[in-house]
Amino acid sequence: MGTVSRTLRNVLPICLLLLIPNASPAQDPDMLRHFDYDQKAPIGIKHAGVQRRAQATVYDITYESPKGGVVPAYLVVPKGSGPFAAIEWGHWYWQNSSMRNRKEFLDEAIVLAQGGVISLLTDGPVARPGHEPIKDPIDERQATEFIQAVIDMRRGLDLLLARKDVDRQRVAYVGHSYGANVGALLSGLDRRIKAFVLMAGSMSDEVNAQTKGYQEFRQKVGAEKLDAFVAKYSYLDQGKYVSHAAPAVVFLQFANQEKFLTPELAQKHAAIVSEPKQVKFYEAPHSLNAEARRDRIQFLTEQLKLKRLPEAAIAGIPNLYQPPDPNE
């Protein structure tokens, strides 16, 4: 369940590698029920503020998490009456990034509003007020926070699809790093999403477990303890879901300048993903670059049948800063 590149880079993972042989397919109800929630419960939207931009209105909101507490989010609404396409965005978890939250894709979402997109950008559990850092790599919260992140995204879909100005047939998800891991699991779980952009994320714990880095991590943590944890949460291996993403289309964006998720390893991850899919590599660090942004906007424009955006508007979106690794 999660980014092995971050696990091995930081030693202290955001989400551990969860692997068990001969796992059930994603359609297995016993696996899927871990992500059930009460869809009939009130969403509980509350407004905290509003910013009116030239091409869109940005609402600062919260909605209730089925796992407790509230989910802070931005809701970006285009001008006009719709019907609009809808995109959910999942941010990265890079430790010392100021964009380790719903702000990561805000500028991109505002530009896409010109093409007719309503966007929901959420704060993952790590970015919410009162979150306590997890220091133990096999702390149960590694798993429970990942489960909450997935369910909160499903609840966010409920929020979007409850709107009369959203076209239910034009819904996408964009996720980066940890957000890509969440999206990979969603792709085999929630059929309401028609297209996925998964950026710089590992797609299979089984692939990761074959690496030397994983074996070293296993010995460091304690093989018996880690194996027990892995077995308990085996249903969180995103490879069991993204291999069943079809008929949704998946666009995988990988960075060539990764310390762990090398192009060779990334190709093995890409092979796990069901067709139809697209795969592209970029000469960039984990944050990716402007070329990747142009490509995913083009992909989203085609998949969601959006209005073409001015090149100047796309070029004006700032690049995500890549901080140095705090553990090096």
For every predicted segment, state its role:
Residues 73, 83-93:
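Short beta-strand element of the alpha/beta-hydrolase
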Residues 93-151, 208-216:
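Cap/lid segment of the alpha/beta-hydrolase catalytic domain
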Residues 267-328:
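C-terminal catalytic histidine-bearing segment of alpha/beta-hydrolase fold enzymes
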Residues 259-265:
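Conserved alpha/beta-hydrolase "acid-adjacent" motif
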Residues 245-246, 251-254:
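Short beta-strand/loop motif that positions the catalytic acidic residue
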Residues 37-81:
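N-terminal cap/lid segment of alpha/beta-hydrolase-fold proteins
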Residues 154-213:
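Primarily recognizes the serine-hydrolase "nucleophile elbow" in alpha/beta-hydrolase
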Residues 226-241:
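Active-site nucleophile elbow and catalytic-triad environment of alpha/beta-hydrolase enzymes
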